[in-house]
A protein has these predicted regions:
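Aromatic "clamp/platform" in nucleotide-sugar-dependent glycosyltransferases that forms part
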Residues: 316
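Nucleotide-activated donor-binding/catalytic signature segment of Leloir-type glycosyltransferases, i.e.
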Residues: 258, 262-295, 299
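N-terminal subdomain of nucleotide-sugar transferases
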Residues: 1-51
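Conserved donor-binding/catalytic core segment of Leloir-type glycosyltransferases
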Residues: 207-229, 235-240, 250-251
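Short hydrophobic beta-strand element within catalytic cores of glycosyltransferases
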Residues: 333-336, 346
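Acceptor-binding helix/loop patch of EC 2.4 sugar-transfer enzymes
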Residues: 57-66, 115-153, 194, 198-199, ...
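A short, well-ordered alpha-helix in the C-terminal region of glycosyltransferases
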Residues: 362, 369, 376-391, 397-403
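Conserved acidic donor-binding segment of nucleotide-sugar-dependent glycosyltransferases
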Residues: 348-349, 353-360, 369-375
Length: 414
């Protein structure tokens, strides 16, 4: 079976399924990837046959709402050229798997019309019921709904072109247009619960300090520290938390760029803006107790989860972070926001705790209660890991994805 993956940052969400196919000597696995990610992909997956492309520059004078669409069309054209070059060499595929978010899947069917296309749908935008308009501190303008219609254009094209699709969670599936949901399966990428597991002897070292499992450590993780992941709620809650729990240490993992939403009002990012706000209010963060460690290598990041007594995960109604599931797999007691993506996984009082996203007082009191009663939280930790093992383990998710791929390959050969 020959499978082609298309993703500008290969392996991305396809890492584990690509690895499984590469390990199967009966499979030939190819990928089209952005040039910036090609070197890393070669190291991670040496058996992968790579075709890289350089993303073209955006054109000047494009309507601002169309800037992303313009870039996606241009990227789609470059990928189509790469596909045509493969086709001209008589290289064909049983299935093509693509992420449409950057436009790369836009013209796949024009080059390989009879090859089944399996598309990964990460998020379909809407002006109601999800991230947009959720946070009153950062209101959206009256043109927001119109901009989102334009932003969804490539996703609608992908939904129309694909033979089948998959998306990680039921909530993300529910955001898709009703008429397309029947061809999209719910299959998560999966969590390596053998690598991410509880370790009562775990130690995390940072700038001469040693943090150990069993200590009163509160952790927070996001790719980037921004409102979409509740950094404004968390940092503003810290002065009260540090006062209520004098013995705790706080570890914050994440960068200062913006992954989602609007740019920060401070040139150094949202964290700098919030830190300055707290200092001006007379409640500066104690650098001896709050440790912002930036982005970490994966092994170090796992150590942070393993030493955590309480892990805080806050998110707008948006794509669920891998970090929340990995925190649960590591046996952390997760206190999450009572937003739909989190509620799909965590049931308050059964495998974690939930608080209103905006309620800082509830967040503080729930953290303090968890720290004061560690024995009570033990059952929640065990149930959290069991949830991830039962529903999101690689051993379950990768075979489910391979089943989708093989079913489409079978349709082509039948």
């Amino acid at each position: 079976m020959r499978v082609l993956f298309i993703h500008q940052n290969i392996p991305g969400q396809f890492r584990h399924v690509i690895a499984a196919l590469c390990a199967d000597v009966r499979s030939g696995v190819w990928a089209i990837v952005g040039a910036d990610a090609a070197a890393r992909a070669r190291v991670l997956l040496p058996r992968l046959n790579l075709v890289s492309y350089t993303a073209p520059a955006a054109s000047a004078g494009t309507h601002p709402w169309l800037a992303d669409v313009d870039a996606q069309v241009r990227r789609g054209q470059v990928v189509a050229q790469a596909l045509q070059q493969l086709k001209d060499k008589d290289i064909g595929f049983d299935v093509i798997v693509a992420h449409p978010g950057w436009g790369e899947a836009m013209f796949v069917k024009d080059v390989f019309p009879s090859t089944p296309l399996l598309t990964y749908f990460e998020f379909f935008y809407s002006s109601t019921g999800a991230d947009v308009g959720f946070d009153p501190e950062f209101p959206t303008g009256p043109e927001s709904a119109q901009r989102l219609r334009v932003r969804n254009m490539p996703h609608l094209a992908a939904l129309n072109a694909c033979d089948a699709g998959f998306t990680p969670t039921r909530w993300q599936h529910s955001r898709l247009p009703t008429e397309y949901r029947g061809r999209v399966a719910v299959v998560h990428e999966g969590v390596d619960t053998d690598a991410v597991r509880p370790d009562p002897a775990a130690r995390f070292e940072w700038q001469g300090r040693v943090f150990e499992a069993g200590q009163p450590i509160v952790t927070y993780v996001a790719r980037n520290l921004e409102p979409y992941r509740g950094i404004h709620v968390f940092l503003r809650a810290l002065p009260a938390l540090l006062s209520a729990a004098p013995g705790i240490q706080v570890i914050v993992v994440g960068g200062d760029e913006v992954s989602y939403g609007q740019p920060a009002p401070h040139p150094q990012g949202w964290r700098a803006w919030l830190t300055e706000e707290l200092a001006n209010a007379g409640t500066p963060l104690d650098a001896e107790r709050v440790h912002v460690v930036g982005k970490l290598p994966h092994a170090q990041y796992v150590k942070v989860l393993q030493v955590s007594a309480v892990h805080v995960y806050l998110t707008y109604p948006f794509v669920l972070s891998w970090s929340m599931l990995e925190a649960m797999a590591a046996g952390a007691l997760v206190i999450g926001s009572a937003t739909a993506p989190v509620q799909e996984v965590i049931v308050d009082g059964e495998n974690g705790r939930l608080v209103d996203f905006f309620d800082r007082d509830a967040l503080v009191s729930t953290i303090v209660d968890a720290l004061r009663h560690p024995a009570r939280g033990r059952a929640l930790r065990e149930a959290a890991r069991a949830t991830v093992v039962q529903r999101y383990d690689l051993k379950r998710c990768v075979p489910a994805t391979l089943k989708l791929i093989r079913a489409l390959a079978g349709q082509r050969s039948s």
